[in-house]
Amino acid sequence: MNMTSNRNWVRRLVVCLSLLFVSEAALADELSKEERDAGFVSMFNGKDFTGWRFDGKESPPKELPDNWKVEDGLIKLSGGGNPHLGSAKAYRDFEMKFEWRAVKDNYNSGFFIRSGEKVGANQINLAKAHEGAFIGGKITGAKEVPQLQKKPGEWNEWRVLVVGDKVTFWCNAQLAWEATGLETKEGYIGLQAEGAPLEFHKLRIRELKPAE
């Protein structure tokens, strides 16, 4: 095999492997049958930020900030401050679950519910030792639950149910708290950039009718 043929073969191999990794990443973020039957839809396609935006700007974003990227089927936050990542769509009553893991021990982020277009209010804290605290809004019953979180490098599953003014929060399949008094009726979902690297995937949501 001459050098030109060898280089072409290597290029084809690299392309095939890249496509394989992308396909595997997309499959890893697919909904299970149980999730589909329950009415969940995926908020993340495992490839890009379709359905999301930064600081209330265009969706999908034309330019990515330095601290957010999609890689290996994951949303990766390298740290830094703004911009936060927000949904392109507003939600009223919903159930959402997602998985996150800390890359380092000293992590900090947050999960926004019914927030403004530039997400920043109504945050369930995701800062080490303060996970679960409610910031930027007033509800009664929320509390810090660091004891329910796993150590850095392991995946945590958070689940949040928002119906009317009530918010119910689970960590790793354990009920963390139930709170009432959420004032905003509708808003955006988001993830906070707060100076620490984290990774997210398996973002699922189902919208609920008021009667649910």
Language-model features and meaning:
Residues N8, R12-L13, I205:
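Positively charged, low-complexity intrinsically disordered regions
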Residues M1-W9:
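N-terminal secretory signal peptides that target proteins for export/translocation
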Residues R12-E24:
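Bacterial N-terminal signal peptides
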Residues L27-E212:
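Carbohydrate-interacting regions of secretory-pathway proteins
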